[in-house]
């Protein structure tokens, strides 16, 4: 028998405000404490080169593992959410990040740091970031771009974290700085408590039928669709006791905008199945939804994943190597840290403006996204011309503005393109493939430096990846026509 525990306030439409702004605050803090500290790895990069006398390629693996796991662990995060719930998953992620930084303070080698500063914070970041992103999409629709931009602007606060990190390293050495980073990340435990579950009532109720379960869906584009989940032997979730008594079975309706909640923690934990057999059926249904092969038949999945993969690969190369390149040009490391600060300020402002403009719906969001990617590519191809501090600052300003513009639109563009697919599965699988590329990005850039003894090749590589990442969005109209021809 199905029972619902706890009282969840039902709504007939997405809030676009209210408690949703508390979710944005949590998402903002995730970007400040986790993503912001990830970006300050550029400063630790130089310190580790001196401390462990490693090559750029070897040390690049630390940042590469940290960055890629945030994406690669996407499917794992969805499974953990299904088991523990979104709030608990986020709290677990905060503890993992904290533990990673604390253990890293005892590091004696680069391989040790690859595990403690690469794997653990990367895995914890995946838990924190994906949960916050998915919950945000549940609370916002019309203001999704703006709310996401405000949340992601926290990443831009590296303009405070960069000099602060350098100050901590000078004052307490790199070991003390990592201990303090762990303490700071622990603040995400109470902020994760803000992740209150939400349930959106479906306007067109449709029950689970005898031949497979049919879920009423209202996607991001407000098109009514149906997701059919064929369970083992096409069986349905029924109250076995009620059925034997000859009473009608109960229907369960889930709106598509919140359909992932059915197999995510908040709703899953309120559904208690008394029969082990029925529990197995629901678990099987969840796994099939999580690894839904229908995504591989969706052209929009390929369009988004291609762009997401290459843009994330390109983004972390200049981020990690900017300070190191400034040092090779004879610029003092403290002055170089100001480059990161300026980039953080402008990226923050750019994200908020980009999100607000996109929410006006003057043109489709992916057009803005595509334009920013092209501009990022051109900027990085011109980066080797910046050989003095003023020119390097000019490059930093341009790149921060354009990067902030496209970063603010990743989640809104995903929601627009995923259509009938739930955000959790679409984002998780796309992130997995993107993470595989991000894993190789910084080491490749480091190898290029070790081979050429200049960072020019790294920035050329980043620029080419940005230009290639924009190509897939030119196929969106073609994919839309193909989709329309099937209906």
Curated annotation (Swiss-Prot):
Residues 220-237 have a biased composition (Basic and acidic residues). The keyword Membrane applies. The chain crosses the membrane at residues 17-37, 60-80, 88-108, 110-129, 144-164, 175-195, 300-320, 338-358, 373-393, 395-415, 426-446, 459-479. Residues 38-59, 109, 165-174, 321-337, 394, 447-458 are extracellular. GO terms for cellular component: membrane; plasma membrane. It is a multi-pass membrane protein. It is found in: Cell membrane. GO terms for molecular function: monocarboxylic acid transmembrane transporter activity; symporter activity. Residues 206-250 are annotated as: Disordered. Residues 1-16, 81-87, 130-143, 196-299, 359-372, 416-425, 480-487 are cytoplasmic. Signal peptide: none annotated. The keyword Membrane applies. Residues 238-250 have a biased composition (Polar residues). GO terms for biological process: carboxylic acid transmembrane transport; monocarboxylic acid transport. Belongs to the major facilitator superfamily. Monocarboxylate porter (TC 2.A.1.13) family. PANTHER family: MONOCARBOXYLATE TRANSPORTER, MONOCARBOXYLATE TRANSPORTER 5. Proton-linked monocarboxylate transporter. Catalyzes the rapid transport across the plasma membrane of many monocarboxylates such as lactate, pyruvate, branched-chain oxo acids derived from leucine, valine and isoleucine, and the ketone bodies acetoacetate, beta-hydroxybutyrate and acetate. This is Monocarboxylate transporter 5. It comes from Homo sapiens (Human).
């Amino acid at each position: 028998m199905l029972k619902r525990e706890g009282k969840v306030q039902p709504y007939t439409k997405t809030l676009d405000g209210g408690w949703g702004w508390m979710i944005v605050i949590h998402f903002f803090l995730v970007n400040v404490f986790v993503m912001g500290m990830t970006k300050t790895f550029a400063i630790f990069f130089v310190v580790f080169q001196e401390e462990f006398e490693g090559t750029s390629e070897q040390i690049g693996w630390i940042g590469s593992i940290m960055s890629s796991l945030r994406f690669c662990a996407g499917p794992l995060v969805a499974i953990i959410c299904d088991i523990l719930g979104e709030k608990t998953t986020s709290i677990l992620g905060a503890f993992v990040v904290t533990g990673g930084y604390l253990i890293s303070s005892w590091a004696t080698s680069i391989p040790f740091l690859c595990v403690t500063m690469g794997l653990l914070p990367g895995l914890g970041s995946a838990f924190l970031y994906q949960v916050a992103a998915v919950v945000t999409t549940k609370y916002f629709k019309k203001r999704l771009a703006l709310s996401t931009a405000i949340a992601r602007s926290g990443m831009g606060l590296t303009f405070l974290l960069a000099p602060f990190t350098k100050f901590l390293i000078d004052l307490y050495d790199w070991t003390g700085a990592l201990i303090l980073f762990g303490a700071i990340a622990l603040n995400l435990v109470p902020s994760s408590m803000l992740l209150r579950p939400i349930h959106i009532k479906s306007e067109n109720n449709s029950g689970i039928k005898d031949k497979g379960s049919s879920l009423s869906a209202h996607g991001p584009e407000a098109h009514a669709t149906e997701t059919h989940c064929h369970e083992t032997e096409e069986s349905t979730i029924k109250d076995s006791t009620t059925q034997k008594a000859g009473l009608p079975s109960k229907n369960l309706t889930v709106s598509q905008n919140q359909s992932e909640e059915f197999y995510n923690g908040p709703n899953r934990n309120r559904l208690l199945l008394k029969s082990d057999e029925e529990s197995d059926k629901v678990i099987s249904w969840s796994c099939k939804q999580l690894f839904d092969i229908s995504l591989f038949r969706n052209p929009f999945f390929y369009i988004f994943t291609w762009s997401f993969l290459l843009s994330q690969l390109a983004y972390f190369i200049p981020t990690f190597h900017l300070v190191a390149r400034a040092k090779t040009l004879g610029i003092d490391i403290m002055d170089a840290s100001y480059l990161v600060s300026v980039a953080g300020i402008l990226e923050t402002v750019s994200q908020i403006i980009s999100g607000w403009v996109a929410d006006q719906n003057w043109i489709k969001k992916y057009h803005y996204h595509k334009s920013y990617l092209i501009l990022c590519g051109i900027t990085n191809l011109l980066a080797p011309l910046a050989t003095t501090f003023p020119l390097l600052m000019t490059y930093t300003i341009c790149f921060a503005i354009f990067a902030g513009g496209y970063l603010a639109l990743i989640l809104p563009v995903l929601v627009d393109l995923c259509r009938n697919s739930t955000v959790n599965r679409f984002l998780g699988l796309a992130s997995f493939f993107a993470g595989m590329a991000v894993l190789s990005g910084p080491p490749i850039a480091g190898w290029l430096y070790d081979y050429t003894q200049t960072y020019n090749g790294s920035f050329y590589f980043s620029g080419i990846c940005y230009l290639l990442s924009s190509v897939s969005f030119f196929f969106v109209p073609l994919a839309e026509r193909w989709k329309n021809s099937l209906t």
